[in-house]
């Protein structure tokens, strides 16, 4: 039996369904929301081979006409070129304003598809069916859509809410271990922001979650989605406290950009390191006990998440000044200053604009120098 959460945004409110077996029931759950019984499904080559038939059979049973497109997997797909080709495919399929777009995949597919839906015919409805832990607990909820540019990650996009989110816990069993761990970093984030009891629960049950325990996975996804739904309902456009959800992401986006969005560092892995850097900076500024940084590092290390910078492809090396240069492109820059998400301890994140450049550079230099 699935659990249902609500994102309370007035006339744009929507439900998040979390549970097992949702993919086979997707057609029945989607049908009442459709202006016309027609959807356009966007997925990637990985999900096509694993789950697309199940979704299409469910849509067929519900009498929903379905077309779609299959894109290459990976962060490189989240760019202008693929946005253009996706919009062309939607127009070639004669999508109308009554056609609902279904994002069926991980964060890349969800972000790209949501952005395409927001601009196609000046906005058509879309539904999220996230297939990774990262997308189930984070990117599918809240309406952030977008693509990457050569200047940085997610710098072109829109706030555009889905009509429904279906998070089927069963599909997580087909994730590669590295992908599952990458998503787990975003789960940890919710404990670090304002839920120390959840972080303590993760210390006890995180390994079971990664090893396939359905109860642990369901609890983690529900807790994470509930936390994000509360924040989004209170601050949809990130004018204030929603920025707390970016804990670790200012550092992470710099790491990803400098790493070329390649296989050296997945998004969740960058977030894991970024959260450690944020806690490290907080400790150096005298804001956070060093014991909390050590506790976070121990937990991430115990679950095989990175606690040091990985080697880059041959011919490239990490550089603290190069990493710092990416901070100026962060979406949280205001009047030329970055708003950092720091912490007074586990479960005590807060926003801070009074951070010295030299302090940030010192953190980056130490991390680059680590073996």
Feature roles, as predicted:
Residues 1-99:
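ATP/NTP phosphate-donor binding region
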Residues 108-115, 136-137, 254:
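Short glycine/serine/threonine-rich phosphate/pyrophosphate-binding segments
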Residues 201, 205-321:
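Active-site segments that bind and position negatively charged phosphate/pyrophosphate groups
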Residues 60, 92, 161-165, 170-177, ...:
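Generic secondary-structure signature for well-ordered alpha-helical cores
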Residues 8, 33-34, 94-96, 119-121, ...:
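Solvent-exposed alpha-helices and their adjacent loops that cap or buttress functional pockets
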Residues 17, 115-208:
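A glycine/threonine-rich phosphate-anchoring loop and its flanking beta-alpha core
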Residues 3-5, 185-187, 287-371:
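C-terminal charged capping/lid subdomain of soluble metabolic enzymes
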